[in-house]
Amino acid sequence: MISFSSFYQQIADSTLQHWLEDLPAILGKWQREHKHGNLPKWEKVLNKLNYAEPDSVDFVDSVTIGSGSQLSAGQQQKLENLLRLFQPWRKGPFNVHGIDIDTEWRSDWKWQRVRQHISPLAKRTVLDVGCGSGYHMWRMLGDGAARVVGIDPSPLFLCQFEAIKRLAGNQHPVHLLPLGIEELPPLDAFDTVFSMGVLYHRRSPIDHLYQLRDQLRMGGELVLETLVIDGDENTVLVPEDRYGKMNNVWFLPSVAALMLWLKKCDFTNIRCVDVDTTSLAEQRSTTWMPNESLVDYLDPKDINLTIEGYPAPKRATIIATKNQPNFDLI
């Protein structure tokens, strides 16, 4: 069974220590509820990942674990076969002992767009909301974060993360907890909070912004990346049914509307640092994720539209600072 005890020990004397009042019970409940399904099978695969410490790691320019020379060809093939049991791999890429995990998303491209605009992560305590299998968490660690905590309720993402962590060495201060943000108490403790690719999946985007705010210390930085559309501060797209074949997309605001929402939620220093239309090269099917991908979600006659006729995915990155609430507006 995947254990979270090392995380409890690491935060016992940190700014996150008051989380220990609730967290063990919450995660204990999660473990009891996931005794069946695929989790036990994936945990058996994790237990087979008994490899020596890698001779090198790189989290600064990539997520690369091992030089590729430690394993024989046979050992390398065995490891690849084990890692493929965690398919589909969506966020990456990873290179593990010379094995290229070619994920659906080129998450490294997103990181290159984002990292140049954010406050330096050196010595910061970071929260990554909706972290997937944790690719960006490793890059945050590579940029000097003191501790990175990711939350995502998916058991598969947890097991993919655990696989990478066990191969990288468990000593790294990076942890994934299988939780949604609604299960977090207001911690007011993180220096930087990331929410990338989450807001449009929330039925109440304003509530999500307040939940993110509740995790930041005063003066902490929010890095928000989400789908947007063109328009003024009153423009918001609410798909009638599906968007890009997804039935869990609720609100796509314009950049101006999103910045207004953040202002209303008592964020300051709000600025849009990047707007980028998702390319077919950034999100695509691979042998590690052989299912449908972006090309299947777009109009085959016009890739500027989704298959439903909405504007094709365009993503904006907004950075903002947690400010004292304006009680005159409450």
From Swiss-Prot:
Keywords: Transferase, tRNA processing. GO terms for molecular function: methyltransferase activity; transferase activity, transferring alkyl or aryl (other than methyl) groups. It comes from the Bacteria. Its EC number is 2.5.1.-. It catalyses: carboxy-S-adenosyl-L-methionine + 5-hydroxyuridine(34) in tRNA = 5-carboxymethoxyuridine(34) in tRNA + S-adenosyl-L-homocysteine + H(+). InterPro entries: CmoB (IPR010017), Mo5U34_MeTrfas-like (IPR027555), SAM-dependent_MTases_sf (IPR029063). The keyword RNA-binding does not apply. Pfam families: Methyltransf_9. Gene3D superfamilies: Vaccinia Virus protein VP39. This is tRNA U34 carboxymethyltransferase.
